[in-house]
Amino acid sequence: MKRAVVVFSGGQDSTTCLVQALQQYDEVHCVTFDYGQRHRAEIDVARELALKLGARAHKVLDVTLLNELAVSSLTRDSIPVPDYEPEADGIPNTFVPGRNILFLTLAAIYAYQVKAEAVITGVCETDFSGYPDCRDEFVKALNHAVSLGMAKDIRFETPLMWIDKAETWALADYYGKLDLVRNETLTCYNGIKGDGCGHCAACNLRANGLNHYLADKPTVMAAMKQKTGLK
C-alpha cells in the first residue's frame, strides 16, 4: 500500500497537494502545525478540509516553542504584515526562521511511524517569496539528512516547486477542485478565508495567479501539464 504524509496548512498550496496526493496514494495522512501563528484560523480550516477531502488521518502538532524562538510578523501581533512583495534578494518579515526545517523533520518522523514512503510539501521556488526554506536545494539537502538520520528512505515530494501560482490554480482545476480551493482554503496572513483580506503579500500573490489563470485557461493549463507531466 502506498502511503504519504502531507504537510497541511489548509492554504491553497497544501490543499492542492492534498487533492493530488489523494489521487496518487492509497492512504494519505495530514500533519498540521500549531505554532501560535497570527493566522491561527488555518488550523480549523485544515481540520475541515482534511475530513472533507478524505484524508486517512489528520494530526495537529503543538510546536508553540517555535513561536518563542522565531520572531516574525506571523508570530508577533506587534509586527505588521507587509502588503507588498519583497525585493528579489530580500527576506520578508513573514519569514519564520526554521519553520520548514522543523515541519519537514516532524512530518518525516510521523511518516516513519505510519510507514509512509513520502512527505509532501507545497513549497515553491518559482513564485519565490524570499523564503530560503522553500528552495529546492534546501528541501533536497534536508531530505538527504533525514534519510540518513532515520536509516530509511522517506522521500520529500514538492509537486509545486517549478510551477507558478497561476499553474497551481490550473492544477486544482485539473482535479476538479478549483472552487473548493478558492472558497474554502485560507492563505491570507491576516487569517481570512477564501479570497482573504486582499492586501497582504499572500493574498496578492494568490489573486494575481488566479486572475492570470482565468484570463487564459488553455495556455496556463497546457504549461502546467508540460511541467508536471500530467496528461
UniProtKB/Swiss-Prot annotation:
- EC number(s) stated in the UniProt entry for this protein: 6.3.4.20
Q: Does the keyword ATP-binding apply?
A: yes
A Gene Ontology biological process annotation?
A: queuosine biosynthetic process
Q: Which InterPro entries match?
A: QueC (IPR018317), Rossmann-like_a/b/a_fold (IPR014729)
Q: Which UniProt keywords apply?
A: ATP-binding, Ligase, Metal-binding, Nucleotide-binding, Queuosine biosynthesis, Zinc
Intrachain S-S bonds: none
What's this protein's family per the entry? Belongs to the QueC family.
The protein's annotated pathway: Purine metabolism; 7-cyano-7-deazaguanine biosynthesis
Q: Which reaction does it catalyse?
A: 7-carboxy-7-deazaguanine + NH4(+) + ATP = 7-cyano-7-deazaguanine + ADP + phosphate + H2O + H(+)
On cofactor binding, the record's note says: Binds 1 zinc ion per subunit.
User: Know the name of this protein?
Assistant: 7-cyano-7-deazaguanine synthase
Give the top-level enzyme category: ligase
Q: Which cofactor does it need?
A: Zn(2+)
* Lineage summary: Bacteria, Pseudomonadati, Pseudomonadota, Gammaproteobacteria, Enterobacterales
Q: Which Pfam families match?
A: QueC (PF06508)
- In this chain, ATP is annotated as bound at F8, S9, G10, G11, Q12, D13, S14, T15, T16, C17, L18
- Role: Catalyzes the ATP-dependent conversion of 7-carboxy-7-deazaguanine (CDG) to 7-cyano-7-deazaguanine (preQ(0)).
Residues annotated to bind Zn(2+): C188, C197, C200, C203
